Regions:
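Alpha/beta catalytic cores of nucleotide-metabolism and tRNA/nucleoside-modifying enzymes
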Residues: 1-31, 36, 41-42, 49, ...
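Glycine-rich, positively charged N-terminal anion/phosphate-binding segment
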Residues: 6-24, 35-119
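Active-site beta-loop-alpha junctions enriched in small/polar residues
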Residues: 35-37, 60-62, 106-108, 132-134, ...
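Non-cysteine beta-strand/loop elements that form the S-adenosyl-L-methionine
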Residues: 57, 126-134, 191-202, 254-262
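Glycine-rich, proline-tolerant flexible connector loops at the mouths of alpha/beta enzymes
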Residues: 59-74, 131-149, 199-208
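Active-site beta->alpha loop and helix N-cap motifs at the rims of alpha/beta catalytic domains
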Residues: 79-169, 174-182, 187-190
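Positively charged, aromatic-enriched nucleic acid-contacting surfaces
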Residues: 409-445, 455
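Short arginine-rich
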Residues: 453-467
Length: 476
């Protein structure tokens, strides 16, 4: 888009009213760092509950946010920024975090960054520009650590934002191989008027297994006046006291935590770490309360469980496809059902039954096709997921049970017709003059057939609906 078009685009944003809340102060703060797929609303709220002073969102890319629509969600009491192309939530926030949430932005263009800033500034406490991410996606787009190689562009982006927005602007960088060059870079960025700068104490090419360099951060902190936020010490962080120790080693004004918080967000508690099951329960309740995407909730729980995913309970968890199923494992099934019904009554459509959201648009396209409509006309459908871990032996699998039942009753064996959409499958089970199917799309043909057989067994009265609801197979 040309510069003229960008200026025209920006003119559509009215000058926001002055914010009533105090300007965010970055000194003497314990902060949850930006983490991809982790820093969504439930985890941010839990971090604040545990004692964090400031929470950062996961990195959100400017182009994705620019095209989103801001929508108040009265059912959840949230503000949602929605992708109009598929209805997915790009960014969700609420009043519980407004004064303490910082949105981290992935950008390589000052005009785009400003457009995002004007769109979101009334719903956040601060805006941070990612200048440290070494991932290939960021580098190729000229974002993240790529900006470390272009200080002039980095400074221009920051100066544009500090000049035109009412909220404090920060950036997050990595150290350079040379300490003096790092100091020079930080001084150039500080001169743009930013409120603070987060520094990961490793270079662009170093990874978590490498030791951080707190001595470099100490040298930088003594050379500038703005707050320095130390990051990169998770290897040695196991308790709240460890956070303060790393901050002191770096001579920093504040400390920012990523991996240690991802493993157990109760590291922010001054009173001590909580057991992981208690943390997971607290997290899942927030996921239910704020209708968090199941795939995102599952990813965060996996990060907490680590090697416990290999236990029987962990393996059952890995089979889960919905938030309801995950909650059943931690004794929150009734809470999830009750809350989702309550939210539905208040007008929240919800995404509780959606997994693999990257395939959502393809599913919707397939489901709208006339061919599929014809295929599923007259088919008895239920929201039924096949969870392999709930069946101890092959003889108990739904297809086998239905096959044996047909033999005992002298009826023709059931047959299956399966449809495929890219890597997703849905099957119709034909048995005794009727056709049955699950409304879920499964990862493979076998699971799709088992789901269809489950629907048949339930509708024919050979399975108990309450049992299926309790084990998470059936979503009401």
């Amino acid at each position: 888009m040309s510069r003229f078009k960008w200026l025209s685009f920006l003119s559509n944003f009215p000058r926001p009213k002055m914010r009533k809340q105090p300007r965010l102060d970055y000194r003497n703060k314990i902060i949850m760092a930006p983490m991809v797929r982790v820093g969504t609303l439930p985890m941010r709220l839990l971090a604040l509950e545990m004692g964090a002073d400031i929470v950062y969102t996961e990195e959100l890319v400017d182009l994705k946010l620019i095209k989103s629509l801001r929508r108040p969600n009265p059912a959840l009491n949230t503000i949602d920024f929605v992708d109009p192309s598929d209805g997915t939530i790009v960014f969700r926030t609420c009043s519980r975090e407004t004064s303490r949430v910082v949105l981290q932005l992935g950008t390589s263009d000052a005009a785009r960054a400003l457009a995002v800033g004007k769109l979101v500034q009334n719903d956040i406490a601060g805006l941070d520009i990612n200048m440290g991410c070494p991932k290939e996606f960021s580098i190729k787009g000229g974002m993240g650590a790529a900006l470390l190689s272009d200080p002039e562009k980095a400074a221009h982006i920051l100066r544009t934002l500090t000049t035109h927005l009412d909220i404090p602007i920060t950036c997050k960088i990595r150290i350079l191989p040379d300490t003096l060059e790092t100091i020079k870079l930080v001084q150039e960025l500080a001169a743009t008027g930013i409120a603070a700068i987060g520094i990961h104490a490793r270079t662009r090419d170093e990874r978590p297994q490498h030791h951080p360099h707190p001595d470099v951060l100490r040298a930088v902190a003594s050379a500038v006046d703005i707050p320095i936020i130390a990051n990169g010490g998770s290897r040695s962080m196991h308790t709240y006291e460890d956070l303060l120790k790393f901050q002191e080693e770096c001579g920093a004004d504040s400390v920012m935590v990523a991996r240690a918080a991802q493993l157990n967000v109760s590291i922010f508690r001054k009173q001590g770490i909580l057991p992981i099951d208690e943390v997971i329960c607290k997290y899942l309740k927030l996921c239910v309360d704020y209708d968090n995407a199941p795939h995102n909730s599952k990813y965060c729980v996996q990060s907490i469980l680590k090697e416990l995913q290999e236990t029987p309970r962990g393996k059952r968890f890995l089979q889960c496809q919905t938030l309801q199923q995950i909650c059943e494992i931690w004794g929150l099934g009734d809470y999830c059902r009750r809350k989702q019904q309550e939210l539905k009554e208040h007008g929240n459509g919800g995404r509780a039954n959606v997994i693999l959201t990257e395939c959502l648009a393809k599913r919707q396209k397939l489901e709208r096709s006339e061919d599929l409509a014809d295929e599923y006309e007259g088919v008895i459908c239920r929201n039924m997921a096949f969870l392999r871990s709930t069946y101890p032996s092959d003889t108990q699998l739904p297809k086998m049970v239905l096959y044996v039942l047909a033999g005992k009753l002298g009826k023709q064996a059931p047959s299956y017709e399966t449809h495929q959409c890219d890597k997703l499958f849905r099957s119709i089970c034909s048995y005794d003059g009727q056709r049955f199917s699950s409304s879920f799309w499964e990862k493979n043909k076998k699971q799709a057939e088992q789901g269809a057989a489950l629907v048949a067994l339930l509708q024919l009265g050979h399975l108990n609906e309450k049992t299926l609801l309790e084990n998470g197979s059936l979503i009401s």
